[in-house]
UniProtKB/Swiss-Prot annotation:
PANTHER family registered for this protein in UniProt: UVRABC SYSTEM PROTEIN C, UVRC/OXIDOREDUCTASE
Cell compartments where the protein resides: Cytoplasm
Function description: The UvrABC repair system catalyzes the recognition and processing of DNA lesions. UvrC both incises the 5' and 3' sides of the lesion. The N-terminal half is responsible for the 3' incision and the C-terminal half is responsible for the 5' incision.
Organism: Clostridioides difficile (strain 630)
Keywords annotated in UniProt: Cytoplasm, DNA damage, DNA excision, DNA repair, Excision nuclease, SOS response
NCBIfam families: uvrC
Name of this protein: UvrABC system protein C
Spans through the membrane: none
Gene Ontology, cellular component aspect: cytoplasm; excinuclease repair complex
Gene: uvrC
Subunit and partners: Interacts with UvrB in an incision complex.
HAMAP family given in the database record: UvrC
Length: 605
């Protein structure tokens, strides 16, 4: 038995993170503290100053754990990661972990490429973004590609020139200057990259002036073809500027403007992204579990969770209200960025007006979201209420688990479990099972096996649904009885056209009305569990089909196998390859080339 009062006496005064747990050992809250002793004790002292949310949490605390850190900054980083991992019930939690694309210019290469990426690496390349509008990113990349003939391949240029590799089609259709041929200098190629970087850096007007000067100069010197090239670039640049520009701001800094609206147990945070003095995008985020948490606490939670996931940190955060832990958050953001980051709360002027505009957008979105969410809630909870009534359940089936067995031509049986919590897919709870004890195609015994294995772990569901009829239900019913478990159990059966028809148990059969929310809900569960099983089965089958004799060679993994097959086209060509030819393959060293060469020579002997 965990004695809370005794453990409170043993708390250290150092900074760290504490984890509150309920009687099921679930983490229900994660927090950080400068002094663990002072902070954790506050929860168990007089509750008169506690919010209703904290009072509710304290009632459910069965025990607590803590992790000591060297500093408050380390505690903040650990807190962010633990909240992301466990999504505790009483923390304010960001509903979606959104990541955004960047445009990467591979300036760490002699002949750079332009790519769309999701991660920013410390690789000496240049990154631009993040961009919230993916369509705009794709349009920008397409315009760059159509305007500038830069390479898109990963080929080693020096090796291609040395081996006189045949250039790809892009050279012949004027989509690439063809640096792999050795006919374009780094300086000539670099001029194109400089223009692209100017455009992506927000210096479009300066680039426009430069291109117009070059066009006029070419025209005056009767180089009309060259002038036409500059004219086309200017036209593309004007189109790009039109797509990227939304509005101008009072500063040319990179800034994020953050404001919030709240209602009931949810809050909406709206962020406007400003890059080089222009609003390049906006995004909304829904926070759950806010209840009666102070605004300063909610905004602080958002900043921690959102920027913990972002690769790019702006120079300045403009926030509508003061937030908790402002100074330590500035320190953390600065350490992530590698230079000073400032959090500002404007009191007047244009920045204050900008924050107000962002807040109005947050209010408008939350109103729409709340109406939409209310309709969804009524639809989903309505289906659960109907399910409770029609199956004569004692309580609402908050957690529903559905099972299916998949095999192809009677072999490699796979079991799958999907989970619905409050009528929503709970994908982190999905599980797959390889059948261990059943030989051959036997859906009944296979279904019994996976449910038996499932019952050995975790909290039990309120309702079990099987993709099948009376046979599957009877087999699993025996498993429940052997495990001394009483869980409502029903099969989901289909009609002659293989469409969901109704629910069945040992004693009765219920045909569902196709016009109801309940029918649509059950049909979606049956389709989900079936697809989950089939998808996994396909991946196993594809993996088996791609197995090759190359898998038996020491040092050859998926990456090198792919490189070998791309280079030589088939295994027969690899068998005949010389050591010199093997060493030309990407990612190949002498030791691995020896292994490949000797493997096929031994095979011949």
């Amino acid at each position: 038995m965990f004695d809370i009062q005794e453990h409170l006496k043993k708390l250290p005064s150092e900074p760290g993170v504490y984890l509150m747990k309920d009687k099921y050992d679930h983490i229900i809250y994660v927090g950080k503290a400068i002094s663990l002793k002072n902070r954790v004790r506050q929860y168990f002292q007089s509750s008169k100053n506690h919010t209703s949310k904290v009072k509710s949490m304290v009632k459910n605390i069965y025990k607590f754990e803590y992790i000591i850190t060297d500093s408050e900054l380390e505690a903040l980083i650990l807190e962010c990661n633990l909240i992301k991992r466990y999504r505790p019930k009483y923390n304010v939690v960001l509903r979606d972990d959104k990541t955004y694309p960047y445009i990467k210019v591979t300036t760490n290469e002699d002949y750079p490429r332009i790519l769309k990426v999701r991660r920013v690496l410390k690789d000496k390349a240049k990154y631009f973004g993040p961009y919230t509008n993916i369509t705009a990113v794709n349009d920008t990349l397409e315009l760059i590609s159509s305007t500038y003939p830069i390479r898109s391949c990963k080929i080693d240029i020096d090796k291609a020139i040395k081996n006189k590799t045949r250039p790809c089609l892009n050279l012949h259709i004027n989509k690439c200057l063809g640096p792999c041929t050795g006919n374009v200098s780094k300086e000539e190629y670099g001029k194109m990259i400089e223009e692209i970087i100017m455009c992506l850096s927000g210096k479009e007007e300066k680039l426009m002036e430069l291109l117009k000067e070059k066009m006029n100069e070419s025209s005056m010197n009767f180089r009309f073809e060259e002038a036409a090239v500059y004219r086309d670039k200017i036209k593309s640049l004007e189109e790009m500027i039109q797509k990227q520009k939304i509005d101008a701001t009072v500063s040319d800094l990179n800034q994020d403007v953050v404001a919030m609206a709240r209602a009931h147990n949810e809050a909406c945070v709206q962020v406007f992204f400003i890059r080089n003095g222009k609003i390049v995008g906006r995004e909304h985020f829904i926070l759950e579990g806010v209840m009666d948490s102070p605004r300063a606490s909610i905004l602080s939670s958002f900043v921690k969770q959102f920027y913990n996931e972002q690769e790019y940190i702006p120079k300045e955060l403009i926030i509508e209200d003061e937030i908790e832990d402002s100074s330590i958050l500035e320190e953390w953001l600065s350490s992530k960025k590698g230079q000073k980051v400032t959090i500002r709360v404007p009191q007047k002027g244009e920045k204050k007006s900008l924050v107000e505009m962002v807040r109005k957008n947050a209010v408008e979105y939350l109103e729409k979201f709340s109406d939409m969410n209310k309709r969804k809630y009524e639809k989903s909870i309505g289906a659960l209420e109907e399910l409770k009534q029609i199956l004569n359940l004692e309580k609402l089936p908050i957690r529903i688990e559905a099972y299916d067995i998949s095999n192809i031509q009677g072999v490699d049986s796979i079991g799958s479990m999907v989970v619905y919590t409050n009528a929503k897919k709970d994908k982190k709870e999905y599980r797959r099972y390889k059948i261990k004890t059943v030989i051959g195609p036997n859906d009944y015994d296979s279904m019994a096996e996976i449910v038996d294995r499932r019952l050995k772990h975790g909290n039990l569901p309120d309702l079990i649904l099987l993709d099948g009829g009376k046979g599957q239900v009877s087999a699993v019913k025996k498993v429940l009885e052997l495990n001394d478990v009483d869980i409502p159990l029903w099969g989901m059966y289909k009609d002659d056209k293989h469409r969901t028809k109704g629910l069945i148990c040992k004693e009765k059969e219920i045909e569902l009305d196709k016009t109801t929310n309940l029918y649509r809900f059950i049909a979606s569960i049956q389709e989900e569990v079936h697809n989950y099983a089939i998808t996994y089965h396909r991946s196993l089958r594809n993996k088996a089909l791609t197995k090759s004799i190359l898998d038996d060679i020491q040092g050859i993994g998926e990456k090198r196998k792919k490189s070998l097959l791309n280079h030589f086209k088939d295994v027969d060509a690899i068998k005949k390859a010389t050591m010199e030819e093997l060493l030309e393959v990407d990612g190949m060293n002498k030791s691995i080339a020896d292994n490949v060469y000797n493997f096929f020579r031994k095979e011949e002997n």
